[in-house]
């Protein structure tokens, strides 16, 4: 009991220690829970540099226990206005990356879900959660593969495509290119992926991923258009711009490439 009192004293009566070693470890949601403990913690948080965060909403994706999720579930009146139904709650629970919390939402609360749940699991590379979603017939669409590609989760993408037979579309290549995941693009070629559109080269160019841009053009034979040049130029990726010019990529209307110089309007 004495030890608990000493810890409590450190938290509420030693700002130097608390502000340096305790509050920085709390996410925004934890901070709001601390604030609500009692009058002492409310004063503490208001004294800190993080008091402005109290105005922000709880984030279900930051919650780490069933007890905190229970509170969020019971306070539906405080859910964001853009949550059209409870499937958004399940989606956010999946973002916690904790399967036991998703199981609680589904099995204890009978929370409805949609494809957003498995998309969140795919982006985080949580194979165990994805297998749970598949086993329990969570809706799935082509965004699951795209989300795995976006975060470079090759094993997840392989599982979704080869085991689950999940569909994929042009976003899979484009989102892989956006974050420079060359290994994902190589896998797509290996699997004879044929959903390329000009978005993939545009993403690679505007984000400065020259290796991906080269691979898309030379190996994957992905199409491109003037947006690739514009994107690379506007985002200051001269190596990508030069590669596009050397390969005769179409230019935006009014732009010219003459005598080794690019003229824009």
Predicted regions located by residue number:
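Ankyrin repeat (ANK) tandem alpha-helical domains that serve as protein-protein interaction scaffolds
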Residues: 1-265
């Amino acid at each position: 009991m004495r030890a608990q009192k000493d810890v409590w004293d450190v938290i509420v009566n030693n700002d130097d220690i608390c502000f340096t070693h305790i509050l920085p470890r709390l996410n925004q949601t934890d901070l709001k829970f601390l604030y609500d403990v009692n009058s002492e913690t409310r004063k503490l948080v208001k004294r800190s540099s993080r008091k402005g965060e109290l105005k922000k909403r709880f984030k279900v994706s930051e919650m780490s226990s069933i007890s905190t999720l229970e509170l969020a579930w019971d306070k539906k009146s405080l859910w964001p206005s853009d949550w059209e139904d409870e499937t958004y709650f399940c989606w956010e629970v999946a973002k916690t990356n904790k399967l036991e919390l998703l199981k609680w939402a589904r099995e204890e609360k009978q929370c409805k879900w949609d494809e957003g749940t498995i998309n969140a699991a795919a982006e985080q590379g949580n194979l165990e959660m994805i297998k749970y979603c598949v086993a329990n017939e969570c809706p799935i669409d082509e965004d699951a593969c795209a989300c795995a590609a976006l975060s470079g989760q090759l094993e997840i993408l392989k599982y979704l495509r080869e085991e689950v037979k999940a569909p994929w579309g042009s976003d899979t290549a484009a989102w892989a290119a956006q974050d420079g995941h060359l290994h994902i693009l190589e896998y797509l070629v290996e699997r004879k992926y044929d959903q390329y559109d000009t978005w993939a080269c545009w993403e690679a160019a505007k984000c400065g991923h020259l290796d991906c841009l080269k691979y898309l053009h030379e190996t994957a034979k992905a199409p491109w258009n003037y947006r690739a040049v514009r994107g690379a130029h506007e985002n200051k990726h001269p190596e990508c711009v030069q590669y596009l010019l050397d390969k005769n990529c179409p230019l935006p209307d009014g732009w010219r490439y003459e005598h080794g110089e690019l003229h824009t309007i």
